[in-house]
Curated annotation (Swiss-Prot):
<protein>
    <recommendedName>
        <fullName>Putative phosphoenolpyruvate synthase regulatory protein</fullName>
        <ecNumber>2.7.11.33</ecNumber>
        <ecNumber>2.7.4.28</ecNumber>
    </recommendedName>
</protein>
<dbReference type="InterPro" id="IPR026530">
    <property type="entry name" value="PSRP"/>
</dbReference>
<feature type="binding site">
    <location>
        <begin position="152"/>
        <end position="159"/>
    </location>
    <ligand>
        <name>ADP</name>
    </ligand>
</feature>
<dbReference type="GO" id="GO:0004674">
    <property type="term" value="F:protein serine/threonine kinase activity"/>
</dbReference>
<keyword id="KW-0418">Kinase</keyword>
<keyword id="KW-0547">Nucleotide-binding</keyword>
<dbReference type="Pfam" id="PF03618">
    <property type="entry name" value="Kinase-PPPase"/>
</dbReference>
<comment type="similarity">
    <text>Belongs to the pyruvate, phosphate/water dikinase regulatory protein family. PSRP subfamily.</text>
</comment>
<dbReference type="GO" id="GO:0043531">
    <property type="term" value="F:ADP binding"/>
</dbReference>
<keyword id="KW-0723">Serine/threonine-protein kinase</keyword>
<comment type="function">
    <text>Bifunctional serine/threonine kinase and phosphorylase involved in the regulation of the phosphoenolpyruvate synthase (PEPS) by catalyzing its phosphorylation/dephosphorylation.</text>
</comment>
<dbReference type="GO" id="GO:0016776">
    <property type="term" value="F:phosphotransferase activity, phosphate group as acceptor"/>
</dbReference>
<dbReference type="GO" id="GO:0005524">
    <property type="term" value="F:ATP binding"/>
</dbReference>
<keyword id="KW-0808">Transferase</keyword>
<dbReference type="InterPro" id="IPR005177">
    <property type="entry name" value="Kinase-pyrophosphorylase"/>
</dbReference>
Length: 272
């Protein structure tokens, strides 16, 4: 079955998209065509949105699923005239919260993502800059300021994981690629020894690593299965020898990898 899904907001659309994606992921037998539509903040835009939804309904033969975080009642009423199944995220969850807290919500657009109301904005930017500045072992003299240091073979997912933790949680994460020389010595490089308590290892299935490296350097020793299998085996031996906690990243999303790392290392998120 194929269905269309719209994530509609009068702000960035981040909330509607994040929650909507999580809910749709529970239906593995349905194929969704997904459309994010931020800043639907006027009745004119809402009417144009209704046309898009109705076209999708006619094309699919099923009414689209609509996740919205629209604040303006007039705009919501226009969207409700479409041939779509609407899930109003704010009204669904805010009403019972208001009852439980005996407090009316501000119901304001972009509340959780606006710079003016988010004291964590600068921490997020600083964490991202830290991840970029300390990527791929480029610098090691700032490791004393790191919350975490990810280690592993080249192209096993260290960089995207560091950036995700920086963006989402303000975690200052560096990453260091272990080289063939490190593997042969079966000991940590000098730059990492003083920070062993911050280390977390990522490993990966050799066949998956081969596929990833072939996209970057096809038909090279670097991307050969034999080389990938050797590096993964030796790095896992090093992790066990040095008692470094680690996980296999092959079958996990960056979100899942990040959550597992934070739990395993007991690192507190700077913001949630």
């Amino acid at each position: 079955m194929k269905r269309s899904a719209f994530f509609i907001s009068d702000g960035t659309g981040i909330t509607a998209e994040t929650l909507g994606q999580s809910l749709l992921a529970q239906f593995e037998n349905v194929t969704f065509s997904k459309f994010t539509r931020p800043y639907i903040d006027s009745m004119e835009k809402a009417r144009a949105m209704v046309q898009q939804i109705n076209i999708a309904a006619e094309k699919d033969g099923h009414r689209p699923i609509i996740f919205d975080t629209i604040v303006n009642q007039d705009i919501r009423e226009i969207l409700a005239t479409s041939n779509g199944f609407m899930i109003d995220i704010f009204s669904t969850f805010l009403a019972p919260l208001e009852q439980e807290l005996s407090e009316h919500s501000s119901y304001s657009v972009g509340k959780s993502h606006s710079i003016g109301h988010n004291s964590n904005y600068m921490e997020r930017i600083e964490a991202v800059n830290f991840a970029l500045d300390n990527d791929d072992g480029a610098r090691t003299h700032y490791y004393d300021k790191a919350d975490l240091i990810l280690v592993g073979v080249s192209r096993c997912g260290k960089t995207p994981t560091c950036l995700y933790m920086a963006m989402q949680f303000g975690i200052r994460a560096a990453n260091y690629p272990l080289t063939e020389e490190d593997m042969e010595r079966l000991q940590l490089p000098n730059a990492l020894r003083a920070h062993k308590h911050k280390l977390f290892g990522l490993t990966i299935d050799p066949d998956r690593l081969t596929a990833i490296r072939n996209e970057r350097k096809p038909n090279s020793r670097y991307s050969s299965y034999a080389q990938c299998e050797f590096e993964v085996r030796e790095v896992e031996n090093l992790f066990r020898r040095e008692n470094i906690p680690h996980i296999n990243s092959t079958h996990f999303s960056v979100e899942e990898i990040s959550a597992k790392i934070l739990v395993e290392k007991g690192v507190e998120r700077r913001f949630k």
